[in-house]
């Protein structure tokens, strides 16, 4: 029976781990994941989604601070894996780790490589308004998402997709793809297709400050940004309320062709939400927002409670 050590941390890899664990043709001697970390305002120490999944299936969990240390390498060698399957782990694997398995190391990546190598391929696909994206399983090498392609599959990006919804669908696709990849390896029919580096692009790790909305941009571009940054870091603007500049997070909008005003100007407030003008033409109807220190709510309720006036310009440095 093929021995597969699964290496991952985030929930993108959960469906893949579940699929391998439930497939009787493979055994998982261990799951390697990042150390438990404090999360949220309460700083409660919470195990990773991969650790929780592993424990549910009674799989031994190994949580090294550094997977490339001599001790970690020795521990993984002791497991005698045929394959490493890596997904959303959070550490770069050294050549010494990649050489441990008898067959090789596979990585499940949320894009159609060589497009969007790096940390944020799902957000990049939405921000760039791509019509399709997908998942690629590669044979790992020492580069960042540069290994030979074993298998890939695509799906359509919906105009309403957020990073959360697209993440979920790609994770499910990844699970189907890793099982097909393992089957191909078992049958001795697993290809190694070199990536075309001339077509490579990179999706760097997202920083919170990137989520500040520039209202001079096109309404479609702003809409894509809002969807790409939901649920994290969440697109935001600023609004002056009672003489104070506050941060307003924006979760959901509807593209409008009828907004006329300067970029960021509130041109209409009604039960449907807050209509804000964008650059070039048209605007966005804000539907779900969250003022700093408050709960997420319908934009109409926020406008009423904050006494937001038509003509207010969002994103202004100084009060009007």
Swiss-Prot record:
Swiss-Prot/TrEMBL catalytic activity: L-methionyl-tRNA(fMet) + (6R)-10-formyltetrahydrofolate = N-formyl-L-methionyl-tRNA(fMet) + (6S)-5,6,7,8-tetrahydrofolate + H(+)
Underlying gene: fmt
GO CC field: cytosol
Family, similarity comment: Belongs to the Fmt family.
Database matches in HAMAP family: Formyl_trans (MF_00182)
Keyword terms: Protein biosynthesis, Transferase
Function text: Attaches a formyl group to the free amino group of methionyl-tRNA(fMet). The formyl group appears to play a dual role in the initiator identity of N-formylmethionyl-tRNA by promoting its recognition by IF2 and preventing the misappropriation of this tRNA by the elongation apparatus.
MF annotations from Gene Ontology: methionyl-tRNA formyltransferase activity
The UniProt record lists the keyword Amino-acid biosynthesis: no
EC number(s) stated in the UniProt entry for this protein: 2.1.2.9
Top enzyme class: transferase
TM annotation in the entry: none
Protein biosynthesis recorded as keyword: yes
Gene3D superfamilies: Formyl transferase, C-terminal domain (3.10.25.10), Formyl transferase, N-terminal domain (3.40.50.170)
Cited Pfam families: Formyl_trans_C (PF02911), Formyl_trans_N (PF00551)
Residues binding (6S)-5,6,7,8-tetrahydrofolate: 111-114
Name recorded for this polypeptide: Methionyl-tRNA formyltransferase
Record-linked InterPro entries: Fmt (IPR005794), Formyl_trans_C (IPR005793), Formyl_trans_C_sf (IPR037022), Formyl_transf_N (IPR002376), Formyl_transf_N_sf (IPR036477), Formyl_transferase-like_C_sf (IPR011034), GART_AS (IPR001555), Met-tRNA-FMT_C (IPR044135)
